[in-house]
Amino acid sequence: MKTAAELRQLVTRIDHRSYPAYKDTKGMYQFPGYLLSIDHVQGDPFASPSRVSIQVKGKIAGFPEQLYQTKWQKTALEDALIRQFGQCCEKFGFKAKGSGKSGMISISRCGQEVLERSAAQIDEKTGDIHIRLEVGFPANGRTINAREWIRIFFEFLPECVEKALYYKNCDAKRLQKISDLAEDQQALRDILPKLGLCAFVANGSILPRESGVSARPMKSAVCFQSPEEMEVEITLPHRGVIRGMGIRKGITLIVGGGYHGKSTLLKALELGVYNHIAGDGREYVITDSTAVKLRAEDGRSIKKTDISMFINDLPNGKDTTHFYTEDASGSTSQAANVVEAMEAKAGVMLIDEDTSATNFMIRDELMQRVIHRDMEPITPFIERIRELYEEEGISTVIVAGSSGAYFHIADCIVQMDRYMPKDITQTAKKEAEQFPQLSGPKEKAKKPDFARKPQQGREWKGNDRIKMKTLGKEAISINRETIDLRYVEQITDSEQVTALGYCVKYAQRHLLDGTRTLQEVVAMLEKKIEKESLAALCESTSSVASLARPRTQEIFACFDRYRGLKL
């Protein structure tokens, strides 16, 4: 291992040379208080920035063990360190001058959710901190600018390390509050099933967001207040007693007029699978961590999914136990989404009437009279929803504004009235008695077959040059094959999409051999991440990308939408 002084001498020696000479700097260097590793050097000042990592020994960093002794506290502290380091990076970003991306210093940009990321890792045994960031190596045109490079690595980065990664220079009370909040959120998440709940929304929560492009809380928004009938009281380790609306397991219907807050509540519930930072307004909006938001998804591909519990006897004679299409309709796509959520072991399904296929959700009495059941291949969701709960233990939360069909079967009916919830179960049930209940299914559905066994694609055999590109939160391109993730609505960060791409790449290279089911493949990916870290998906220390951990359910969703998957 070389010293910082040797690195300075090396860069001074290659000053004014052609830009590729920067590649000589690749390696590890001991700086006072930390280890610097230059993992990947960009080939051009206009290319993606160089990848750099910093390691600080636990004894030097000095963060108390109680701040990272549990998994969720560790993730919360890592998130806080990324935010602190990022603030320092912003202070120095582009202060070093030059062409292209010269002087750029960046680290993962965290949102309102607290996610496990490759940008910061703490060793729970030693307290060692590992930070990954990107730096644009300075250039004049396409020649090396050593003076500006030295400013970045010998002035700017040492100050960032000292201010953000040494406990003695951090706000100790703030970090303790972050740790306590993480512990409270996990305690609340753990207690939900014991209370028979699938979700909880604390009184005083701020659910509306600032705008369609901002996830920050809306100013002057109406604070959430639970209906008295649904209010539960929970004691947390640090916050103490907290009260709010408990959504019980079973079938919950959210109704109300337009613009009264139905979809806003559902949106908060769908993102309640993640913990949120202090001040977000949704810190204590907690949902079963396996909950999945479902919708119709016209045009998506379906790969040998067993949708026979909803769709049978198609006029074209297609086998719905191994249904395949490259262009699904609204109803078939939503049927597949439900079955795939079951395959991913979802405990709760979240559905909004606005984004659902009507013929999949309901079939009214008049339509049943005109078009006989024997002529309709679709068994609507309303006829399976009770069975899903009683046989599979899957709860459902549905938002409806135009159809009262679900009044008959809902266990709880909540009306949103000017952003405030009301329990109208008894009133709605009484009114529903005046309307005939639609007939149920002829027989119980056969449990879907989850025996799909993906194989390695031909183009992956012996090919180490597969290219991948993340397209924001909406899609990822692998070997020119685009995986469309626009409607996987619980993806909250583009770095999760990048991680999903690496999941596919790793699986294609090591796991897809035609002998393992998709469930087994995903379980093996999860085990690798849990045991070795998120960065292990990249398989090379020189190519660790900025990754955020997706849930199991999103990993399944990515494979399900991968048109290049061979089954």
Q: What feature does the model see in each segment?
A:
Residues 1-196, 207, 567:
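N-terminal accessory targeting/assembly segments
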Residues 145, 300, 310-331, 363-378:
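Flexible beta-alpha connector loops of hexameric P-loop NTPases
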Residues 193-197, 203, 259, 266-297, ...:
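Carboxylate/His-rich catalytic cores and anion/metal-binding grooves
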Residues 208-243, 278, 286-302, 307-318:
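N-terminal pre-Walker A segment at the start of P-loop NTPase domains
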Residues 242-274:
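Glycine-rich phosphate-binding P-loop
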Residues 329-341:
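Conserved alpha-helical scaffold flanking the Walker A/P-loop in AAA+ ATPase domains
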Residues 341-385, 389-390, 402-408, 412-429:
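Conserved P-loop NTPase nucleotide-binding/switch module
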Residues 390-393, 399-567:
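Conserved NTP phosphate-binding and transfer environment spanning the P-loop NTPase/kinase superfamily
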